[in-house]
């Protein structure tokens, strides 16, 4: 009887939800490919840097974070303290969420003084890093959800159980949770993944400009804060302080804000080396207009 109650699932997945899942998965797979092709066409690219970026994500985003998490929990008394004090648990989750981004910044800081590094090197590294994250993590989860949803609509719980290789008497209540999520949220999750990737790529260009122009290191602090802000909603959701449905919209808004700030900064100080990638006619127009006004002033004096 308990098994039957555990497998009770009400309704089916709406077609709109299925479509949004598929579109989201396609977006997450296509994004790094499109960005990679665009960068290859605009800059001298090296496939080796793509591979380095991919390995960096595996080492930092997956292996190191998991090892760090296990190491923290193995410290005597830590698990008990985290169970007793929510603040400590929240702090640990926040740190684990932010560690990959700070590690990524550290890699760039380590290589920033190498003169051989050009914008293509930075971009290809980030494309490799982003591709692994989006394709192997985000897109895999989204397409897996889509397969489960299509299988359930076609063959019911028995089909899902057969696909997963488990008993049909198990607990499939998670299907109710998946159906309760509006289809647009799945689509927004894919869009948010692409926005986050754009933010990171913007950081790469930003980092290149900071290094090339020898600007103040306070920009690194701004970057670290923005990275942290992007990861805060997920960390709050992990510890139960933010509803799951609110995470993607909030992260998307934060990413849009970060992108807006990056674009403003880039438009103010685009160096000649970045011109082929981010050339804007209006910027050239303003430069010519400014040069004309300066020549007039010099002639007047």
Locate predicted features:
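Hydrophobic alpha-helical segments at protein termini of multi-pass membrane proteins
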Residues: 2-301
């Amino acid at each position: 009887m308990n098994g039957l109650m555990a497998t009770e699932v009400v309704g089916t997945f709406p077609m709109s939800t299925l479509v949004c899942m598929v579109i989201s998965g396609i977006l997450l797979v296509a994004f790094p490919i499109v960005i990679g092709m665009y960068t290859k066409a605009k800059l001298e690219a090296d496939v080796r840097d793509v591979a380095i970026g991919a390995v960096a994500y595996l080492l930092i985003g997956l292996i190191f974070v998991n090892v760090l998490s296990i190491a923290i929990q193995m410290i005597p008394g830590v698990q008990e303290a985290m169970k007793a004090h929510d603040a400590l648990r929240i702090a640990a989750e926040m740190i684990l969420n932010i560690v990959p981004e700070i590690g990524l910044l550290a890699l760039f800081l380590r290589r920033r003084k190498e003169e051989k590094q050009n914008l293509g090197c930075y971009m290809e590294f980030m494309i490799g890093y982003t591709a692994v994250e989006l394709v192997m993590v985000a897109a895999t989860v989204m397409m897996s959800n889509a397969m489960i949803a299509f299988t359930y609509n076609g063959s019911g719980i028995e089909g899902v159980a057969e696909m997963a290789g488990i008993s049909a008497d198990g607990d499939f209540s998670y299907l109710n949770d998946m159906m309760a999520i509006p289809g647009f949220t799945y689509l927004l999750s894919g869009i948010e993944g692409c926005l986050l990737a754009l933010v990171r790529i913007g950081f790469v260009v930003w980092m290149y400009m900071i290094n090339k122009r020898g600007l103040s290191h306070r920009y690194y602090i701004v970057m670290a804060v923005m990275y942290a802000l992007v990861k805060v909603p997920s960390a709050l959701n992990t510890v139960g302080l933010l509803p799951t449905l609110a995470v993607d919209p909030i992260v998307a808004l934060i990413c849009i804000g970060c992108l807006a700030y990056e674009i403003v900064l880039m438009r103010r100080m685009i160096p000649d080396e970045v011109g082929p990638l981010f050339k804007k006619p209006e910027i050239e127009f303003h430069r010519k207009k400014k040069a004309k006004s300066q020549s007039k002033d010099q002639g007047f004096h």
